[in-house]
Swiss-Prot record:
Keywords: Heme, Iron, Metal-binding, Oxygen transport, Phosphoprotein, Transport. The modification Phosphoserine is found at S14, S51. Heterotetramer of two alpha chains and two epsilon chains in early embryonic hemoglobin Gower-2; two zeta chains and two epsilon chains in early embryonic hemoglobin Gower-1. Belongs to the globin family. One of its GO terms (biological process) is hydrogen peroxide catabolic process. Heme b binds at H64, H93. One of its GO terms (molecular function) is hemoglobin alpha binding. Residues 3-147 form the Globin domain. The keyword Iron applies. The epsilon chain is a beta-type chain of early mammalian embryonic hemoglobin. It comes from Symphalangus syndactylus (Siamang). The keyword Metal-binding applies. This is Hemoglobin subunit epsilon. InterPro entries: Globin, Globin-like_sf, Globin/Proto, Hemoglobin_b, Hemoglobin_oxygen_transport.
């Protein structure tokens, strides 16, 4: 289990409370699909993913990105219990969707980039370290049900 200090929790929460989940979620998932095009195979039902502009403008990408980031909010509320928080999502992504767990790490790294672009100078090295620790812990929690 990962332990977060009070300072790390405060650093994560302070930015999260300022985040536009809908905007950042669509941007994060869109960026994942553009930068790592092999991840597109999990989103066949999303329609046109033929170019970066098609992906970033796709309403299904934006809607699912919001859903992903909304569930990430659960991580922030439950930083001391990530494994339990993501148990059902881990099972879904493992048993039904067959998502390569490496993709969780990629999405976490994309989220850190989104935070840096949105928050600029507020995204200090200390804040980045706290977020990097959180996205890594979430990726591990999501990969938990994999054999």
């Amino acid at each position: 289990m990962v332990h977060f200090t009070a300072e790390e929790k405060a650093a994560v929460t302070s930015l999260w409370n300022k985040m536009n989940v809908e905007e950042a979620g669509g941007e994060a998932l869109g960026r994942l699909l553009v930068v790592y095009p092999w991840t597109q195979r999990f989103f066949d039902s999303f329609g046109n993913l033929s170019s970066p502009s098609a992906i970033l403008g796709n309403p299904k990408v934006k809607a699912h990105g919001k859903k992903v980031l909304t569930s990430f909010g659960d991580a922030i509320k439950n930083m001391d219990n990530l494994k339990t928080t993501f148990a059902k999502l881990s099972e879904l992504h493992c048993d039904k969707l067959h998502v390569d767990p490496e993709n969780f790490k990629l999405l976490g790294n994309v989220m850190v980039i989104i935070l840096a672009t949105h928050f600029g100078k507020e995204f200090t090295p200390e804040v980045q370290a706290a977020w990097q620790k959180l996205v890594s812990a979430v990726a591990i929690a999501l990969a938990h049900k994999y054999h």
